[in-house]
């Protein structure tokens, strides 16, 4: 997928999630005005994810440049339409986590504005997820277990943002900590695993800056597969703290490998075990086939 960081097309449309992050609508408009100081761009505050996807597709088919303004979830929606229509997008990270932007070296709004005014183009890695009845993408990582439960709980904590938000969410999950049983198929071989977390990654960050996959881009044509299990509560908490630095991948309970694709099926009846999350959002239920996206 291609991210364009220069606003040079005649028609530019900003699709904005009004609820993303802590910025007010007025503040978001002010930031957008700094990108297009000489023009009055089309700014649309969308009300639903369906509207965001529909409008993105509409304008992309008319060769407009769409700027996704929101968190990882909003950017995910716009990016999926860009992939399906072979379009280019820009981003303004207005969310609480902003892990996809971070993976591109965009660590602030100021940096995002500079990039949109510059001439840099990035061809970005992403994941394809194939469920029984739908297809989705993930720009950062996607998985099951603690990752999914923490992402869900994070949406219920309105006052925090970034890694602190997701760390707190994960700690809440430890109250009823469970390793779930999954059937994992890699390279045609299927094995059952008791896992606390299982994820595929296209880029290094998740959870508002957690360095979950330091080796995400090590192999150009493969995604990073990570999973961990068999940990008691205290050991699991210690492992979580190591995720901030990326040193968790050295823990003996963590399996860190690369593959072109893998399939996960639930072997537990617990509802949490089957929920698949990616880019901080619910994407679907197991079973799922996850592969590295190949379409630019």
Predicted features, each with a name:
Residues 73-78, 124:
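Short glycine/serine/threonine-rich phosphate/pyrophosphate-binding segments
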Residues 158-165, 208-209, 214-235:
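Gly/Ser/Thr-rich active-site loops/lids in small-molecule metabolic enzymes
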Residues 2, 25, 186, 192, ...:
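ATP/nucleoside-binding phosphotransfer catalytic cores, i.e., glycine-rich phosphate-binding loops
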Residues 15, 19, 86-88, 92-200:
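Catalytic core of DAGKc-family lipid kinases
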Residues 1-66, 76, 80:
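ATP/NTP phosphate-donor binding region
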Residues 16-18, 70, 227-229:
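Short beta-strand/turn micro-motifs composed of small residues
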Residues 147-150, 192-194, 205-209, 233-236:
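Short acidic/glycine-rich loop or secondary-structure boundary segments that cap or lie
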Residues 143, 147, 199-212, 282:
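Glycine-rich phosphate/pyrophosphate-binding beta-alpha loops
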